[in-house]
UniProtKB/Swiss-Prot annotation:
Keyword rRNA-binding attached: yes
CDD domains: KOW_RPL26
Originating organism: Levilactobacillus brevis (strain ATCC 367 / BCRC 12310 / CIP 105137 / JCM 1170 / LMG 11437 / NCIMB 947 / NCTC 947)
GO biological process, one term: translation
Subunit structure: Part of the 50S ribosomal subunit.
Gene name of the encoded protein: rplX
Name of the protein described by the UniProt record: Large ribosomal subunit protein uL24
GO cellular component, as recorded: ribonucleoprotein complex; ribosome
Pfam families the UniProt entry points to: KOW, ribosomal_L24
Gene Ontology MF: a single term: structural constituent of ribosome
Protein's job: One of two assembly initiator proteins, it binds directly to the 5'-end of the 23S rRNA, where it nucleates assembly of the 50S subunit.
Length: 103
């Protein structure tokens, strides 16, 4: 998967289409990502010692990686990603602008 933790992405499909956020976690086995502030769900939390009150909390649910696109840092537009070899290392680059994402 080409999307990594810390990438700024835009949702391109689903109920949160158009929203932007930062990837907080990548679930490689399921090909999903968790984006801050996107795909919020309500979880019914049982009371425990750490949370004595319990109740309903809002958390981010995973979203499929195909439903997000990386925001190109050079022009702030969504772009597809590619991989090329520079100085013997694989680096990601933006297909739209051709600029390297990983420094």
């Amino acid at each position: 998967m080409l999307i990594k933790t810390g990438d700024k992405v835009r949702v391109i499909a689903g109920k949160d289409k158009g929203k932007e956020g930062t990837v907080s976690k990548v679930l490689n086995a399921k090909n999903r990502v968790i984006v801050q502030g996107v795909n919020m769900i309500k979880k019914h939390q049982k009371a425990s010692q750490t949370n004595p009150q319990g109740g309903i909390i809002d958390i981010e649910a995973p979203i499929h990686a195909s439903n997000v696109m990386l925001i190109d840092p050079s022009n702030n537009e969504p772009t597809r990603l590619g991989v090329r070899v520079e100085d013997g290392h694989k680096v990601r680059f933006a297909k739209k602008s051709g600029e390297t994402i990983d420094k």
